[in-house]
Amino acid sequence: YKRQQLAQPVTFGHHLLAWHEMLVRDEQRLNQVKVNLNVMPLGSAALSGTPFPIDRKLVAKKLGFKTISSNSMDAVSDRDFVCDFAYACSMIMVHLSRISEELIYWMNTHIKLVDIDEAFCTGSSIMPQKKNPDVPELIRGKCGSAIGSLTSLLVLLKGLPLTYNRDLQEDKGIIIESISEVLACLNLMPRLIVTLTVDKEKAFLFSKEDYSNATDLADY
């Protein structure tokens, strides 16, 4: 599909690999977040550093940090790594939401291209013929919470002067909630995907409809 219209035939495996590529980028983002936060602020004290002759590099090595912070005032007030993490969480949820939307669309009664196990669905309260894709819809909905967490952090930080301000205690609850929701969705999605079945006959019929091979014919 392109712009929700039949476009060109591809294998289902090719489509699944497109989902894989999105998640690979998410993994790369998380790895970069790990690099960015692997800086030891110890020794910055309240804001102006410590007068004691500590060996910060030795302490960093002992604690497993890759490097030390360069400026004590920045180290005390820096929450870039929290925002980076929240952004990575948001992108994971955006990708899971897009996957969910495609599943919901394909399960549409007018298309019925795929189906998932009933464990991830519910029936209707008054329409017994319906099979509602609850888990994909809930994952799609949770995406808004992750984006909201990122927005909350950015708004929290935008007006803060250097160095530490008590406002910063709010970042813990925000990022912990975001992480919790992302982990729950990442736990559910693969369990859902392994139950996915494709109606091969219908997929083959779609591949022949609406001149979807027109581009290949023109190229030929």
Which positions does each model-derived feature cover?
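Conserved small/polar residues in nucleotide/adenosyl-binding loops
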Residues: 1
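Glycine-rich cofactor/substrate-binding loops
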Residues: 110, 129-220
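Internal glycine-rich alpha/beta core junctions
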Residues: 8-156
